[in-house]
Amino acid sequence: MRDLHVKTRIKPAQTRNRVKRERKPINWRPLITWGSRLVCGLAGLATVGGICYGGYRYLSQWEFAPLPLKEIEVSKLQRLKRDDVIAQAGVRPGDSMLGLRLRDIGSQLAKNPWIDKVQVRRYFPHTLAIEVVERVPVAVVNMGFLYYMDAGGTVFKPLTQGDSLDYPVITGVAEEDLARDPVGTREALKGAVALMDQLRRGKEFTLADVSEIHLDKGFGLTLFTAAGGVPVRLGNGGYEAKLARFVRIYGELREHMAAVEYIDCDYLDKIIVKKG
């Protein structure tokens, strides 16, 4: 018998019908409405800000603006005059309090060489206060031209006609030194100030007995006596001890200073007197 081979056909599976989901359209209306409101709000703020700023500028420039300046207070002055300070500040009664530029006023006043520090305050409704700290000269620095120097070693003003010369004279400093090494030069000048302070406290030998203080960055300070113009070398620092040793012999040498070439006190335990 023959085997019967029956070919079996596999019936393809029936595909299921897919259910199509309908996508809902995006509702852009709330987003557009919110964005429009945001843009309108920002535009409104910008408009209000512009109006406020324009009004501020208008009021600050108006001659008879609200909140006029009525009182200008100036701190106590030693050398400067109140009217000169107010004139340099560039303010006057009737100016708008809103239009005052305090920083500009302070910068203008700081140009005055006699003014060390300045502070400007505004007190509503009608007051402006100007507080000034003046410079006090302690010496005259000879740099080809004569300049005043304050206690901080700052050279601040060239002398003009009418300025007092009744101050100790410092030499050995050039304008080029201030330009090339302002910090080092100022420190050296502060050393001269320290020496002058020590001399002011003296009894037998004082600042009045000194005609000149010479500054040398390498060798330090040398003072010149008013009697005979004798150089007394002091070097750098330790002025109290060096002056104390000098005073011990100054009484004996006072009458013979014309015969002395120089005195060197820049030693720890001795003094050299060089006679001419």
Swiss-Prot record:
**Could you list which ranges are Cytoplasmic topological domains?**
1-37
Q: Which HAMAP family match?
A: FtsQ_subfam
The residue ranges for the Periplasmic side of the membrane come to: 61-276
The residue ranges of the POTRA domain are 67-135
Matches recorded under PANTHER family: CELL DIVISION PROTEIN FTSQ
Q: What does this protein do?
A: Essential cell division protein.
Q: Which Gene3D superfamilies match?
A: Cell division protein FtsQ/DivIB, membrane protein fhac
**InterPro entries from the xrefs?**
Cell_div_FtsQ/DivIB_C, FtsQ, FtsQ_C_sf, POTRA, POTRA_FtsQ_type
Name-wise, this protein is Cell division protein FtsQ
Report the subcellular localization: Cell inner membrane
**Has the keyword Cell membrane been applied to this entry?**
yes
Q: Which PROSITE patterns match?
A: POTRA
What is its membrane topology?
Answer: Single-pass type II membrane protein
The record, for Pfam families, names: FtsQ_DivIB_C (PF03799), POTRA_1 (PF08478)
Family indicated by similarity: Belongs to the FtsQ/DivIB family. FtsQ subfamily.
Q: Where are the transmembrane segments?
A: 38-60
Main location class: membrane
Look up the record and report any one GO term of the cellular component aspect: plasma membrane
Q: Name one GO biological process term.
A: FtsZ-dependent cytokinesis
- Kindly state which keywords UniProt assigns to this record, in alphabetical order: Cell cycle, Cell division, Cell inner membrane, Cell membrane, Membrane, Transmembrane, Transmembrane helix
The chain's disulfide connectivity reads none
